[in-house]
Amino acid sequence: MTQYIKKINLKALIFSFILITGFLLLSSQATEAKPKKTPKRIKVIMIGDRLVDIAFNLGVLPEAMSVRCSMWPMCEKLLSATQIMGCPKCIVDRIPNIVPDTAKKRGIKRIIIEKHPNFCFYKPKVKPANIVPLLEGKGMTIEYVDFANGLESAIRQTAELLGRKSKADALINRYNKAMAKAKDALPKEKLGKKVVIINGTYQRATGKTFLRIEMPGGYSDHFMLKPLGCKNIGDALKSKNKKVNKGHFPIRKLSVLSKVNPDIIIMTGNIFAVQKALAIEMKKNPALADLPAIKALAIYGLPFYGDSSVMEYPSILRQWTDALSN
């Protein structure tokens, strides 16, 4: 009887942990995201999220921009500060007139474009420079920031184009110090843990949640799990009829987690959506409490890194390191 009560109490503790952790993570992330100073808005259009991320950290925002909002968390916070025209694919394929029309309407003559050898893992053919043929004969000055020689070079190029050369060294030094600390914090040996990454979306109007599992080989594997020596086992949860879109596939029931026994469960996107789904599933299926990740309370809400928030990479890597090394 005593053992039964202990088991019930453990499940109640886990259930409470899942609920409380999500709320704490959401509030802390919202606090950390606040910029220190309001950036100066200049009369230019920028295309490429890495470019805009650097510009923002140099204290500058374009009057209009094309970025991957689903990949760059800062995008949502800048909706009222600048015009977001759509992603680099949309402005070419779906709304090809938006850049020249926006430039004409706002009196903008200058376009700065990001050049990157691997702009998007999910859409290899998408390049910010694909917009250039649509701007020919429009009287635009087109300039580029080339990331081929690394981030430091890209920072210096951006700073020069924006008249912020004096701020380049400080930003580079800040990044290098943060990166050195992040690397020092990495485990000396591979952790060898099995990880499932669940991305959540919460529909406020209806209260519905939508979940996706991140497939191996994507951004989290390359930038987070590989340095930590962990394995993404999300593909083992994919049924034959599920289609992969942007490195993820949809999932409805988290009871399938029992098939793979993850050591760690990572929640990205809207953490509450994942947290809510886990709590509901545990009520239906109390046996989930015996999964290694849940039993050890190794359930972490972490920011997704899609190689857009380039200046924030060290701090995001450090968060993943702290969580997975625990």
PLM regions with names:
Residues 39-43, 147, 160, 258-260, ...:
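Structured C-terminal subdomain patch of bacterial secreted/periplasmic proteins
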Residues 118, 122-127, 131-134, 267-282:
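A ligand-binding cleft/hinge motif common to bilobed small-molecule-binding domains
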Residues 42-58, 169-229:
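Basic- and aromatic-lined ligand-binding clefts that recognize polyanionic substrates
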Residues 1-8:
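N-terminal secretory signal peptides that target proteins for export/translocation
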Residues 28-33:
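Boundary at the C-terminal end of the N-terminal hydrophobic targeting segment
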Residues 49-124:
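A short, structured surface patch at a secondary-structure boundary
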Residues 68-77, 209-247:
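Alpha-helical, coiled-coil/dimerization segments enriched in small aliphatic residues
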Residues 14-25:
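Bacterial N-terminal signal peptides
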